[in-house]
Amino acid sequence: MTIIRKKHPLIKIINHSFIDLPTPSNISSWWNFGSLLGLCLIIQILTGLFLAMHYTSDTATAFSSVAHICRDVNYGWLIRYMHANGASMFFICLFLHVGRGIYYGSYNMIETWNMGIILLFAVMATAFMGYVLPWGQMSFWGATVITNLLSAIPYIGTTLVEWIWGGFSVDKATLTRFFAFHFILPFIITALVLVHLLFLHETGSNNPTGLNSDSDKIPFHPYYTVKDFLGVLFLFMAFMILTLFFPDILGDPDNYTPANPLNTPPHIKPEWYFLFAYAILRSIPNKLGGVVALILSILILALMPLLHTSKQRTLTFRPITQTIYWILVADLLTLTWIGGQPVEHPFIIIGQTASIAYFTIIMILMPIAGMIENNILNLD
């Protein structure tokens, strides 16, 4: 068996990635989320495939085809809710994974980090298009509002929006193409994940100390396969409790009303995992400015390696930056809350303050804190 594992051209690639992979001996449970994201992706592809067997991407039948899946297909309700809540679990793991990367300075592995940002954009695009497919009220109006943002692009904006819509409004052509893209993107994401892993295995994993761990490596299997399996159990438990007991808690009640272009819902808002970006978008009165801020709210992650001023890699021994980091986490939670609130006083000013704080913390406070810590520790 060992001979096959180490010599077979295909199996040896798997062996070097998941079995004999030299791994730092001290990585914590925060390093579990990579494998959990892989599991989430597999769950989403499988449940999505079974849903696609019964779904129809036509404005006249899309809503009723989802109802048919829940009522008439064997375990259709389970597949549908696993897919819907699987997206939420996916984003929880994604945010924790990115948060871990920021805390422990993993962004210094630039190729892996940039690949991760591309993956984040791809997953967000996939989730957005998936939300449109049930063709409920929030699906329709969410698609209308978000795609309409592209009209803010000077000169080509309006043409671009109509090109994406396939007409003069969100209609049958839009739904059909969104379904096509929603189906193909997860497979593209899978390919990008392999590239992400390829870059990661070029440098090896980071660890909580941020120090070079070449002198202290252990094989991934059995140590981290067992450790990851514990994470899988916790994820699966949370996922099943969510799916079986509270399947609609993260959804919007408006989406149980079929799409109606003549009736606007009182509060148009995306799924919870986009609310922080939506709050940043809404906090700027100018349309183009809002779109730029929305894109920058994610793209700012690409500046992380350039903004790293500290002589230490991680925040483990840096209490000042640690404090600022947790303020950033609180700020993101505030933005998420604001994104779900109506556009009125005091939510407008809170959203604007939180948006300014978000960019200020990342671009100004964290780099300054890094320099102060270098000074205190005489690392200059």
From Swiss-Prot:
PROSITE patterns assigned to the protein according to its UniProt record, in alphabetical order: CYTB_CTER, CYTB_NTER
Keyword match Iron: yes
Membrane topology: Multi-pass membrane protein
Positions bound to heme b b566: H97, H196
GO cellular component, one term: respiratory chain complex III
A Gene Ontology BP annotation from the UniProt entry: mitochondrial electron transport, ubiquinol to cytochrome c
Keywords: Electron transport, Heme, Iron, Membrane, Metal-binding, Mitochondrion, Mitochondrion inner membrane, Respiratory chain, Transmembrane, Transmembrane helix, Transport, Ubiquinone
TM spans (from-to): 33-53, 77-98, 113-133, 178-198, 226-246, 288-308, 320-340, 347-367
Compartments (UniProt record): Mitochondrion inner membrane
Positions of heme b b562 binding: H83, H182
Residues annotated as binding a ubiquinone: H201
GO molecular function: metal ion binding; ubiquinol-cytochrome-c reductase activity
Domain of life: Eukaryota
Main location: mitochondrion
CDD domains, per the entry: cytochrome_b_C (cd00290), Cytochrome_b_N (cd00284)
Cofactor binding, note field: Binds 2 heme b groups non-covalently.
SUPFAM superfamilies according to UniProt: a domain/subunit of cytochrome bc1 complex (Ubiquinol-cytochrome c reductase), Transmembrane di-heme cytochromes
Xref: Pfam families: Cytochrom_B_C, Cytochrome_B
Cofactor: heme b
Presence of the UniProt keyword Cell membrane in the record: no
Other facts: Heme 1 (or BL or b562) is low-potential and absorbs at about 562 nm, and heme 2 (or BH or b566) is high-potential and absorbs at about 566 nm.
PANTHER family: CYTOCHROME B
Function summary: Component of the ubiquinol-cytochrome c reductase complex (complex III or cytochrome b-c1 complex) that is part of the mitochondrial respiratory chain. The b-c1 complex mediates electron transfer from ubiquinol to cytochrome c. Contributes to the generation of a proton gradient across the mitochondrial membrane that is then used for ATP synthesis.
Family: Belongs to the cytochrome b family.
Subunit field text: The cytochrome bc1 complex contains 11 subunits: 3 respiratory subunits (MT-CYB, CYC1 and UQCRFS1), 2 core proteins (UQCRC1 and UQCRC2) and 6 low-molecular weight proteins (UQCRH/QCR6, UQCRB/QCR7, UQCRQ/QCR8, UQCR10/QCR9, UQCR11/QCR10 and a cleavage product of UQCRFS1). This cytochrome bc1 complex then forms a dimer.
Protein name: Cytochrome b
Organism: Microtus umbrosus
